[in-house]
Each structure stands twice: as C-alpha cells, then as structure tokens.
C-alpha cells in the first residue's frame, strides 16, 4: 500500500513539475513574441519617421539643386564669352557670385547609424544605403565649405577692393546703380578667373547634389515598401 501511495505521489509531483515547466515555457514564448512584436512595431515607426525625414530632404535638395545647377549654367555661359547685350551682361554679372546653401540636416539618419544607437533597423540593405546616403550628404557639406571659403577669401574681397560691391547691391535692391561699373566688372579678367574657380568647385558641388538627390529617392522607395 505504501509503495502504491508513494508511486502515486511521485507521478502527481512529476505531473505538477511538467505543468510548471510547460507554463514557464509558454510564458517565455509569449514574452518573446511580445518582445518581437514591440521591436517590430518600433522598427516600423522608426522607418516611418525616417521616411518623413527623407522626403523633406528630397524636397529641399531638389529646390537647391535646380537653383545651383541653373546658376552653374549661367557661369558657363559667362566663361564661354558668348556675345551679349549690355542689359544681358548686367543680369548675368548680378548672379554669378550667388549660390543656394544645400547642406542638409539629417538627425534621424545620424541616430540610426550611430554606433551607440538603441534604435536598430534589422534590414542590412537599408542600413547600407543609409550609410552611402550619409556620405553623400557629407560630400555636399564639404564642397559647400569650399565655395563658402572662395566667397569669403576671393569674391567678396575683390568686389570690395574694386568698389563693385555697392553697384551690385544697388542693382539687387532695384535702386540707382552705375551700369558702367557692372559692365566693367563683367569684362574684368581677374574677376573672370575668380568665377572660373567658382565653376570648378560648383561643378563638383552640384554633381554631389544630383547624386544625393538620386540616392535619396532610392532610399525613400525602400522605406515605403516596409
């Protein structure tokens, strides 16, 4: 009798242990499933936020690229020394030194790619494209620094030193200006050399903007498929 009772107790205890273990395993499975679901939802939210940033960057880049590319063509027209009327020369000379700032802010991309970032994206292909995109944005910023330096060290100095700045400002503000000053500036060989330097920098700068715009469009498509 005692042996039978002991056997029953052992079977009962074993059954209880099995049930407890199964309960723990099920709880762990549910917990893992919840963790995965939360992680997946967080990733989708992050990608949605990333998509918004990319669209904003794309729109900004497009405006800046079109403006700077148009100005680049104007510089080329000036350097090619195509015959122009005095009125056309004044219009051209008033725009040669201009450019539109194009360095973009991308905090979400920076956060995603940060080595210490807790916001992870599991898609390695997307991460690879984001790294390429970040490099492209950095290239724009670097070339923009070069063109800023040229403006600060060469263009503004030349215009001030030769008293052309006031005529340009007056023309831009639609006030009285000396058109002969502007024609003289248009024909100035030193200024033409400075603008040629601007073209060299701006050509690479605009190219990087074009590349970044194309790459941004590509990554937008990738994020919208998620």
Positions of PLM-derived features:
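Hydrophobic membrane-insertion alpha-helices, especially the h-region
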Residues: 14-29
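Long, hydrophobic alpha-helical segments that serve as membrane-spanning/inserting helices
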Residues: 1-11, 32-226
